[in-house]
């Protein structure tokens, strides 16, 4: 099959599988597909005309805001799609994928702990999304980050207190939805206590149901009460709830807990099914069927599935109905929820002009300085390279844009020569920039070597400030967004 062939071609053909074109349309309507490039391929446009649920955009779909607006307009011409992306502020951004976000992320907002500020920041982000034609934001993150070494949440979380996370999640939901952008609160029932990345494997949340209710579920309960339009499922296993299944595939999680116990009747969206927790356990197509049967309404496929994969998933869903493993009524229920969401889109839209200003204000309020930096003398900056997570991608970070007068080198900690770096920094101000040093032993070792010779050096931590070495000055930004970096440099140069 050609890579550009319509993945739904044949869906209206009575000879195709069940012979029910309406059923094929229902199956297609449950999919949020993705594609490469900055313009929509023909197969996507034809698919939207034939009932595909919508699209999820990634960094590779973005050149600038004007281009995204044009892309979204073309998608909306083809149908009534959900047009979504991950815009969390901080490290995870799609609109600012090539520059870094003008807004700090949740950890910075949680550190400030001003819910009015959080609402204003999310409202400003929502205005950006409105201008770009997006109608659903895959955010906010409502995970309570209780595992210091969590490889995938970290600064994406408001913090480790359920109550703090809950009140800021509510503020974020209000900020987004007051501008007409549907919030998608994630990752249910909670990804904050994990030590693994669900992009790579099935993480484990080893918590009793009572602990879940006291900790992980507190922000989700608050978000539901605040009217969150959608909630994203997590590919995490909670033995007390899901057994060995990821929550995305668990009826106990999505139907019994979320729908019945918590009383949620909004749209349930899966995390990307191409993540290894699903694709390398039950597979994409079977994962789609199991997620729908569990209670999901929209299936985010992620960036990897091809047009052929999409066609195969539609066929597999239709086959599952024919085999009695999934009911047409379940698909109709999902479609009705998504249709209600579409009817809500744009009902309330408000323009704001704060943008970068509110983002920088929030970053300035979050950044903290311990010790004294002193005047900078011919600064030499060592940025310690940190491998990006899949959720973040190759978003630029660091202080370089804001310190044009400095000599800046970026090094891999396992390859760096501390002696050579110290030689270059002789008689100069030494600034060491790192992200999440607490999770990277090689980074900590290099910093310790540098500080042993230069205890007057400044350390700028652009992740979570958990490991605090004895430095002349220690700056914590609570995130690596462009706004966080600027706020840190302002402290250094004040």
Predicted regions span which residues?
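Preference for extracellular/luminal or secreted protein segments
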Residues: 1-50, 280-494
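A short aromatic-anchored loop/beta-hairpin motif
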Residues: 33-37, 51-65, 75
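Active-site mouth loops of central-metabolism enzymes
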Residues: 28-40, 106-120, 201-214, 274-282
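Alpha-helical scaffold segments that flank or form the walls of functional sites
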Residues: 113-134, 216, 287-293
């Amino acid at each position: 099959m050609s890579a550009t062939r319509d993945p739904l071609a044949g869906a209206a053909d009575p000879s195709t599988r069940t012979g029910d074109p309406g059923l094929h349309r229902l199956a297609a309507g449950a999919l949020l597909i993705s594609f490469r490039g900055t313009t929509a391929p023909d197969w996507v446009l034809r698919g939207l005309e034939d009932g595909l649920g919508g699209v999820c955009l990634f960094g590779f779909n973005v050149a600038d805001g004007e281009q995204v607006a044009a892309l979204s307009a073309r998608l909306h011409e083809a149908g009534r799609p959900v047009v979504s992306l991950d815009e969390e502020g901080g490290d995870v951004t799609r609109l600012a994928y090539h520059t870094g976000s003008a807004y700090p992320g949740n950890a910075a907002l949680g550190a400030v702990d001003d819910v009015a500020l959080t609402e204003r920041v999310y409202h400003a982000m929502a205005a950006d999304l409105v201008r770009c034609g997006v109608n659903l934001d895959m955010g906010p993150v409502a995970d309570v980050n209780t595992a210091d070494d969590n490889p995938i949440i970290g600064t994406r979380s408001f913090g480790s207190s359920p109550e703090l996370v809950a009140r800021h999640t509510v503020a974020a939901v209000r900020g987004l939805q007051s501008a007409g952008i549907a919030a998608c609160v994630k990752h249910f029932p909670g990804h904050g206590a994990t030590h693994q990345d669900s992009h790579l494997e099935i993480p484990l949340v080893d918590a009793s149901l009572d602990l879940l209710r006291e900790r992980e579920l507190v922000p989700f309960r608050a978000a539901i009460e605040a009217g969150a339009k959608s909630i994203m499922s997590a590919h995490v296993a909670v033995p007390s709830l899901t057994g060995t299944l990821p929550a995305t595939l668990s009826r106990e999680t999505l139907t019994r807990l979320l729908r019945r116990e918590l009383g949620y009747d909004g749209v349930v969206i899966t995390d990307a099914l191409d993540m290894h927790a699903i694709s390398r356990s039950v597979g994409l197509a079977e994962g789609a069927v199991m997620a729908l049967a569990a209670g999901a309404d929209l299936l985010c496929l992620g960036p990897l599935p091809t047009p052929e994969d999409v066609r195969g998933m539609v066929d597999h869903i239709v086959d599952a109905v024919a085999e009695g493993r999934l009911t047409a009524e379940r698909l109709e229920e999902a479609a009705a929820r998504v249709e209600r969401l579409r009817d809500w889109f744009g009902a309330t839209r408000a323009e704001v002009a704060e943008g970068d200003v509110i983002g920088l204000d929030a970053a300035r309020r979050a950044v903290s300085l311990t010790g004294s930096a002193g005047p900078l003398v011919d600064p030499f900056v060592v940025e310690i390279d940190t491998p990006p997570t899949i959720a973040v991608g190759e978003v630029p970070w660091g202080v370089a844009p804001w310190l044009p007068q400095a000599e800046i080198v970026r090094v891999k900690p396992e390859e760096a020569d501390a002696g050579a770096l110290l030689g270059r920094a002789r008689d100069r101000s030494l600034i060491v920039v790192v992200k999440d040093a607490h999770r990277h032993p090689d980074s900590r070792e290099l910093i310790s070597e540098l500080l042993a010779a230069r205890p007057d050096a400044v350390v700028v931590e652009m992740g979570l400030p958990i490991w605090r070495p004895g430095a002349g000055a220690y700056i914590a930004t609570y995130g690596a967004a462009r706004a966080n970096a600027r706020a840190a440099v302002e402290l250094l140069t004040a």
